[in-house]
Each structure stands twice: as structure tokens, then as C-alpha cells.
Amino acid sequence: MSALGAAAPYLHHPADSHSGRVSFLGSQPSPEVTAVAQLLKDLDRSTFRKLLKLVVGALHGKDCREAVEQLGASANLSEERLAVLLAGTHTLLQQALRLPPASLKPDAFQEELQELGIPQDLIGDLASLAFGSQRPLLDSVAQQQGSSLPHVSYFRWRVDVAISTSAQSRSLQPSVLMQLKLTDGSAHRFEVPIAKFQELRYSVALVLKEMAELEKKCERKLQD
């Protein structure tokens, strides 16, 4: 695993209800992106470009630990600040790369970064990565990494009701037992409280709804 670690889980990409644009940052920026936007205001461009080089290396799956230490020492960045810069920039780029260029235009990308308060010269460097000559290679690497991950091959669940043996009260305590198998042969079994199961149902329904809306919006843009 690279020194940057895994990026934050991808947030869905709803459309902006006011402008009709597709937001690559989701309904609201992740904590990593919000934090890095604040730090980038005081970061010089030379250091930022070195930072971007490390992030691109991490996206390619390279081990960047030694280079990270060298950057921290040369730029006089504390370990905590450097971690925020790396994680936030990594998350920001990864979220942008998850949308195809036809759905996320450079102008919309730069406008969202401006709203975060990121300096214009740094926005230009980020846009060059997201829409420049390196984009096809980054897309290819992302596809290869995604195809190597195991997928769910089997899933089932059932409601389980346990009767309390307490002498003071006997109450029904329903829960949901889940079992799934992955394509790598591993199996997992776990128990989920009813309340959490309902949250899961709602979240899945919401994501599916927003995916459908995004697909329709992309189709309309292609038709226009």
C-alpha cells in the first residue's frame, strides 16, 4: 500500500440544484478536502507541485514514504500538516477522476475549487492533472486497481429474534443476520441492529435515486 493510504470513500455526485451542474465533490466536500483547502491558501506553488507529484505516484500505487519524508523536511512542513495536504489532495483528485470528462467539465471543476478558496495558480495545476495528457493513464490505472478488488458473489440476510433471559424483563430484540461471499473465496457473517439496517436501506435507495438522476442529466447533455 502507498504511503498515502486509502482515500476516503467516494461520496455520491448529486447535481447542484441551483446551477444544474454535476458536483464532483458530492452534496458537501469531505472533511479531507475542506481541511486541505484551508492549508493550500498558504502553500507556495513549488511545494504544491512536489506534493502533486507524490499524489500522482500514490494513484499509480507507488510507495512514496521516503519521498514524503524528504518533502516534509525540505518544505519545513510538520508531519500533521503534510498528512492533511496529502490526504486532501489525494481525495480531491480521486473524486474528480471518478467522473468521466463528459460529465465534469474543466470550467465546473475550477469553479468548485474557487468556491473552496483554493488559489487560482494551484487550481490550474490540479486541472492539468484532471483533464490533461496524464488523464488517460490515470484512468487506466484506476480501472486496473478496481478490477483487482474482490466483488460480492453471494449475499443473503434474515431477521433473527432473540428472547431476553433477564429475570426482570423478557423482551424481543430483533436484529438482521447478514452473510456474504466474495469472489476471492472469503466469507463474512455479521449481525446488524434493525435501526442500522433501516439506515442502510435508506442510503442504498438514496444512492440509486441520485445515480438515476445523474444518468438522465448526462443523457440530456449529450443530446444537447
Swiss-Prot record:
Location in the cell: Nucleus
Pfam families: COMM_domain, COMM_HN
Keyword annotations: Acetylation, Nucleus, Transcription, Transcription regulation, Ubl conjugation pathway
Tissue expression profile of the protein: Expressed in the zona fasciculata and medulla of the adrenal gland; expressed in kidney proximal tubules. Basal expression is higher in hypertensive than in normotensive animals.
Segments traversing the membrane: none
Highest rank taxon of the organism: Eukaryota
Modified residues (N-acetylserine): 2
One example of a Gene Ontology biological process annotation: positive regulation of cell growth
GO annotation, cellular component aspect: nucleus
Residue ranges occupied by any COMM domain in the UniProt entry: 151-215
Main location: nucleus
Family: Belongs to the COMM domain-containing protein 5 family.
Subunit and partners: Component of the commander complex consisting of the CCC subcomplex and the retriever subcomplex. Component of the CCC (COMMD/CCDC22/CCDC93) subcomplex consisting of COMMD1, COMMD2, COMMD3, COMMD4, COMMD5, COMMD6, COMMD7, COMMD8, COMMD9, COMMD10, CCDC22 and CCDC93; within the complex forms a heterodimer with COMMD10. Interacts (via COMM domain) with COMMD1 (via COMM domain). Interacts with RELA, RELB, NFKB1/p105. Interacts with CCDC22, CCDC93, SCNN1B, CUL2, CUL3, CUL4A, CUL4B, CUL7.
Function: Scaffold protein in the commander complex that is essential for endosomal recycling of transmembrane cargos; the commander complex is composed of the CCC subcomplex and the retriever subcomplex. May modulate activity of cullin-RING E3 ubiquitin ligase (CRL) complexes. Negatively regulates cell proliferation. Negatively regulates cell cycle G2/M phase transition probably by transactivating p21/CDKN1A through the p53/TP53-independent signaling pathway. Involved in kidney proximal tubule morphogenesis. Down-regulates activation of NF-kappa-B.
Annotated protein name in UniProt: COMM domain-containing protein 5
Gene: Commd5
